[in-house]
Amino acid sequence: MGFPIPDPYVWDPSFRTFYSIIDDEHKTLFNGIFHLAIDDNADNLGELRRCTGKHFLNEQVLMQASQYQFYDEHKKEHETFIHALDNWKGDVKWAKSWLVNHIKTIDFKYKGKI
């Protein structure tokens, strides 16, 4: 089922991980998907892909540095999203849902651990 998708599609405090760099990057990802929903064009998709790659790398570095036990599972989730962006079919609803559910299930597992 999953978590409800916010409308308007913006980050809110319920998505807080309490790591400022990660929360700031999550806000950027929400913004990128929001803009893609308004105008599904190559520029918006490219910007979202760039921001997503940067965020995933930063998050993975933090997880590796702390020897986070669910690193491999988490990285596979990231790879799924990157693959979807690299093979974009225009499914903004899926992207919105993926980010919301990824943060609230997968990312929340590392709260206080990285």
Swiss-Prot record:
Transmembrane segments: none annotated. Signal peptide: none annotated. Gene3D superfamilies: Hemerythrin-like. Keywords: Iron, Metal-binding, Oxygen transport, Transport. The keyword Metal-binding applies. Fe cation 2 binds at residues 59, 74, 78, 102, 107. It holds the Pfam family Hemerythrin. InterPro entries: Haemerythrin, Haemerythrin_Fe_BS, Hemerythrin, Hemerythrin-like, Hemerythrin-like_sf, Hemerythrin_metal-bd. It comes from the Eukaryota. Fe cation 1 binds at residues 26, 55, 59, 107. One of its GO terms (molecular function) is oxygen carrier activity. The keyword Transport applies. Homooctamer. NCBIfam families: hemeryth_dom, Hemerythrin. Belongs to the hemerythrin family. Hemerythrin is a respiratory protein in blood cells of certain marine worms. The oxygen-binding site in each chain contains two iron atoms. PANTHER family: BACTERIOHEMERYTHRIN. The sequence from one of the four major component variants is shown. This is Hemerythrin. It comes from Phascolopsis gouldii (Peanut worm). The lineage of its organism: Eukaryota, Metazoa, Spiralia, Lophotrochozoa, Annelida.
